[in-house]
C-alpha cells in the first residue's frame, strides 16, 4: 500500500501544526511531545454534525485545541494534502460520532497513527476502511517512500477487524457474511461475569469467523433494540441507499427506534443561530423523519406546540425499552446508561448501525472486565456523580489502563443506590473509556421496573457474575470519606475535591440536565437545594443564569406533580423541555464568550463542547448551590455561608 501525501504530526505547539500545514516537514523528534486525548469534539465540532456527506472534509480537525489555540482552519487538511495524521494516547476519545473518521477520510487521510485509540473511534475507522496503527515507526518509513503492506497494518488487530479492513469496510463485509448469521450457541463454560453471560446468549455464528468470546475476540451479536439519533440517521440513510439502493429491506424494523433529542433547542443555541445553521438543522431533521416514515420506524421526536423533545434517548430507553439480561445498541457513546438495569448496552458508530439495520447483527469486540466495588456508606449529600468524577481522576483510569473495558459496579453502595443513581455511573463509563457499564439486577431493579413501567420482572438465576469470574482489574473504592467533587475545565478526568479548591470561582451559567443528570432523583436533588434556598429567602445570584432541563416528559410530569416547578421558578431558574440541549452545545446553558464560567451537571467538558467558555463539572446539588452563591460551592458550603452572613 503506497501512502502518498503529507504527514501531519500533532504535538503540543500550535505553531508546529501551522508550519506543517504550510508545507514544512517536521520529524517526530522535532515536534516533541505528541498531543494526547484528541477528542471527536475536536476532530468534528458539534455544529459540523449537521453535515452527513463528503462536505465534512472541510471541517476535519477545525476544533483541535492546542493550549488556547485552534491551529487547523477550515479545509486545511485538504489544501495541505495530508494523508497521515500522528498523535498520542487516547486518540478519538469522546462521542461515538462516525463523522470524525468520515471527515478525515473524505479529507484524504489514509492512515491515523497514534499511541492508543478509543474503542468506538477505531471501530468506526475499520467500518469505513480507514487504517489505524499504534506503530510510530511507520511514520519515517512512509516519509521515506516505503510501501506498507495491508498485512502489516492489520497484523496486531483481531481477526474480524482484519477481515473488515481487507473487505474495504463493514458494509462490503456484511453483504457477504452477515445475512446468513445464526446463533453461536456458546455454552456456559467456567465462571463468567454477567456481561459474558449476556453476550454468550446473543452471539452469532459468522461464516469464516471463529469466535470463542474471549477478550479481544471480534464478533457479532443480536440486539433486542437498535436506536439511532438524528445526527446519525441521515448519514446512515445516505450510506445505505448509496450502497443498496431503495427501498431497503430492514431487519426487524419493529425493534429499530429513532430519536430526535439533540436539536430540539437549536433555535435557542447561540452557536447555531450565530452561524446561521437553522436551515441545516431543518434539513437534517427532515431527512431523519423521512427515513422513519419511509420504513415505518418508531420516532420519538419533537414535542408539538411546545419546546423540546419527547425524551433524551438514553433516559427513554431505561424508562420504556431496556430489560435485564438483554442487549441494547445505540449510536451514542452514553448508551451504557441502560446498564443500570443489568443489560449489556453499548454505543456504536453510524456504519455499525446501518449494517445492523440490514442484518440485525451488531459488531462487538469482546472486552476484559473491571470490577468496581464501592465500599462503605455514601455520606449525606454525596451523589453518584461525585463517585464518577472521583473514579475518572484515578491514575488507572486517566492513564487509559481500563480503556475499552466492561465496568461492573458492585458493593454495598451500589446495593443502596436507586436505578437513577446507578445510571449516572453506567452512563459515565463513556468518559472512563469503557465499552459498557453494568450493575447486576436486584430488588431495586424489580421495584423500578414495576413502579416506572408496570412490569413484574423476575430475575433469572443466571443474572449475576459468578464468584470466581475473571477480571482484568478490581478497584476497591471507599466512599465513606468522599465529598462533593468537581472536574476542572477541559476534561472530565480533571477531578478535584471541592474541599481542596483553593480559589474562588465565580459562576456565570449553571446548568442541570442531560442524560446524566435529568432523571427523577437528579431533580429531587436540585429541588432539595432550591427549596432550602427559598425557605431562607435566597434565589440565584445576580448575573447568574440557571437552567434546569428534564430528560423525559415523564420526569417533567414527576416534577409538576410534586410542585417542584414552582420552587425552581421562584428562585429564578429557567425550566426547559426535554432535550440534550447544552450538553450537545445545542440550546440554553452554553457560553457565548471565552471569559464565561459554567458549572454543569453534564458528563463531559472537552474544549469547545459547551461553548467558548470554561465548563466545570459537578453534581446536581453543587450546580444549584453554586448558582445561588454566585460561585462554586457545595450545598453544605452554601448553608454555612448563609448562616454566617
Predicted regions and their residues:
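Fe-S-dependent hydro-lyases/dehydratases of central metabolism
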Residues: 1-645
Amino acid at each position: 500500500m503506497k501512502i502518498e501525501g503529507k504527514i501531519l504530526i500533532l504535538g503540543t505547539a500550535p505553531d508546529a501544526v501551522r508550519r506543517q500545514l504550510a508545507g514544512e516537514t517536521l520529524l517526530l523528534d522535532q515536534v516533541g511531545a505528541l498531543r494526547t486525548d484528541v477528542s471527536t469534539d475536536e476532530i468534528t465540532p458539534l455544529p459540523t454534525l449537521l453535515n452527513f456527506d463528503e462536505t465534512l472534509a472541510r471541517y476535519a480537525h477545525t476544533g483541535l485545541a492546542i493550549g488556547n489555540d485552534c491551529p487547523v482552519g477550515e479545509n486545511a487538511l485538504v489544501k495541505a494534502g495530508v494523508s497521515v495524521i500522528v498523535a498520542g494516547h487516547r486518540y478519538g476519545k469522546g462521542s461515538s460520532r462516525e463523522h470524525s473518521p468520515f471527515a478525515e477520510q473524505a479529507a484524504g487521510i489514509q492512515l491515523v497513527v497514534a499511541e492508543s485509540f478509543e474503542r468506538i473511534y477505531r471501530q468506526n475507522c475499520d467500518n469505513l476502511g480507514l487504517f489505524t496503527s499504534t506503530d510510530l515507526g511507520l511514520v519515517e518509513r512512509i516519509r521515506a517512500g516505503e510501501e506498507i503492506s495491508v498485512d502489516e497494518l492489520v497484523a496486531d488487530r483481531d481477526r474480524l477487524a482484519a477481515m473488515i479492513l481487507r473487505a474495504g469496510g463493514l458494509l462490503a463485509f456484511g453483504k457477504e457474511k452477515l445475512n446468513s448469521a445464526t446463533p453461536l450457541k456458546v455454552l456456559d463454560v467456567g465462571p463468567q461475569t454477567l456481561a459474558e453471560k449476556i453476550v454468550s446468549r446473543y452471539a452469532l455464528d459468522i461464516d469464516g469467523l471463529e469466535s470463542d468470546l474471549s477478550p479481544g475476540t471480534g464478533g457479532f451479536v443480536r440486539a433486542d433494540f437498535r436506536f439511532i439519533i438524528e445526527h446519525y440517521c441521515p448519514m446512515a440513510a445516505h450510506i445505505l441507499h448509496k450502497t443498496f439502493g431503495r427501498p431497503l429491506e430492514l431487519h426487524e424494523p419493529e425493534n429499530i427506534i429513532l430519536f430526535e433529542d439533540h436539536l430540539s433547542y437549536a433555535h435557542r443555541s447561540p452557536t447555531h443561530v450565530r452561524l446561521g445553521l437553522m436551515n441545516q438543522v431543518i434539513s437534517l431533521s427532515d431527512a431523519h423523519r423521512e427515513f422513519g416514515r419511509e420504513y415505518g420506524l418508531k420516532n420519538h421526536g419533537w414535542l408539538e406546540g411546545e419546546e423540546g423533545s419527547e425524551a433524551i434517548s438514553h433516559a427513554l430507553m431505561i424508562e420504556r425499552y431496556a430489560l435485564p439480561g438483554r442487549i441494547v445498541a445505540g449510536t451514542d457513546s452514553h448508551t451504557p446508561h441502560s446498564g443500570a438495569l443489568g443489560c449489556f448496552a453499548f454505543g456504536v458508530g453510524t456504519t455499525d448501525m446501518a449494517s445492523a439495520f440490514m442484518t440485525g447483527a451488531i459488531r462487538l469486540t469482546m472486552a476484559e472486565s473491571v470490577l468496581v466495588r464501592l465500599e462503605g456508606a455514601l455520606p449525606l449529600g454525596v451523589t453518584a456523580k461525585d463517585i464518577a468524577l472521583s473514579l475518572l481522576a484515578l491514575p488507572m483510569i486517566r492513564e487509559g489502563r481500563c480503556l475499552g473495558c466492561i465496568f461492573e459496579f458492585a458493593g454495598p453502595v451500589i446495593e443502596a443506590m436507586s436505578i437513577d443513581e446507578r445510571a449516572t455511573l453506567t452512563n459515565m463509563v463513556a468518559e472512563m473509556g469503557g465499552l459498557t457499564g453494568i450493575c447486576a439486577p436486584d430488588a431495586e431493579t424489580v421495584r423500578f421496573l414495576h413502579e416506572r413501567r408496570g412490569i413484574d420482572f423476575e430475575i433469572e438465576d443466571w443474572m449475576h457474575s459468578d464468584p470466581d469470574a475473571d477480571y482484568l482489574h478490581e478497584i476497591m473504592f471507599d466512599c465513606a470519606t468522599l465529598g462533593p467533587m468537581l472536574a476542572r475545565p477541559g476534561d472530565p478526568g480533571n477531578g478535584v475535591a471541592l474541599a481542596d479548591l483553593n480559589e474562588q470561582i465565580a459562576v456565570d451559567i449553571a446548568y442541570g440536565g442531560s442524560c446524566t443528570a435529568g432523571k427523577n432523583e437528579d431533580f429531587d436533588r436540585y429541588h432539595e437545594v432550591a427549596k432550602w434556598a427559598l425557605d431562607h429567602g435566597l434565589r440565584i445570584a445576580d448575573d447568574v443564569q440557571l437552567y434546569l432541563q428534564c430528560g423525559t416528559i415523564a420526569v417533567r410530569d414527576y416534577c409538576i406533580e410534586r410542585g417542584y416547578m414552582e420552587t425552581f421558578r421562584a428562585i429564578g431558574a429557567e425550566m426547559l423541555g426535554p432535550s440534550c440541549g447544552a450538553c450537545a452545545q445545542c440550546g440554553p446553558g452554553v457560553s457565548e464568550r471565552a471569559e464565561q464560567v459554567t458549572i454543569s451537571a453534564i458528563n463531559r467538558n472537552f474544549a469547545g463542547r459547551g461553548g467558548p467558555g470554561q465548563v466545570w463539572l459537578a453534581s446536581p446539588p453543587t450546580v444549584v448551590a453554586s448558582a445561588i452563591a454566585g460561585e462554586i460551592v457545595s450545598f453544605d458550603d452554601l448553608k454555612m455561608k448563609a448562616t454566617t452572613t
